[in-house]
UniProtKB/Swiss-Prot annotation:
Residues with PTM Phosphoserine: 158
Phosphothreonine modification, residue list: 67
Positions bearing Phosphotyrosine: 132
Stated name of the protein: UPF0690 protein C1orf52
Source superkingdom: Eukaryota
Family designation: Belongs to the UPF0690 family.
GO molecular function: RNA binding
Record's compositionally biased regions (Basic and acidic residues): 50-63, 172-182
PANTHER family: UPF0690 PROTEIN C1ORF52 (PTHR31833:SF2)
Protein's UniProt keywords contain Phosphoprotein: yes
Gene Ontology annotations for the cellular component aspect, listed alphabetically: nucleoplasm
InterPro entries: DUF4660
Tissue note: Expressed in all tissues tested including heart, placenta, liver, skeletal muscle, kidney and pancreas. Weak expression in brain and lung.
Organism (species): Homo sapiens (Human)
Amino acid sequence: MAAEEKDPLSYFAAYGSSSSGSSDEEDNIEPEETSRRTPDPAKSAGGCRNKAEKRLPGPDELFRSVTRPAFLYNPLNKQIDWERHVVKAPEEPPKEFKIWKSNYVPPPETYTTEKKPPPPELDMAIKWSNIYEDNGDDAPQNAKKARLLPEGEETLESDDEKDEHTSKKRKVEPGEPAKKKK
């Protein structure tokens, strides 16, 4: 009991986990304290009385027995140098004002006309020859070649598919005459 009065933090050591204490402290524990760690079912009803008897020490008593860490002291004045431990936040540069982009109509001073480049040039001779279907030998040829069907295939369109652009393909055998629509 006398050892408990000298060290006010022994209250926490008695009920703390075994991993937090050192092996030297575990060797010095009296049998009473070890029996106190394991709660007996008979004493569990009277546990409230035991807690009332064991109270934490007051702050004055606690700080008389506990030593303060050395890094808090200024060796010349033997007082805590709080200014040395103050950490200041880094200063942020002033933010530049940026105009929000929104859907409102901008003032007339800020109007700018968008300059669109001309579309890629189209050879008008090719366009006119396509319009008037003047595709003779002397007509200018378009750089893009039309994709032709492979030999032996021709497209068939049914009456139902005249409106649609899809068409059916069927293979034509070399000896078979081509069928015409009725």
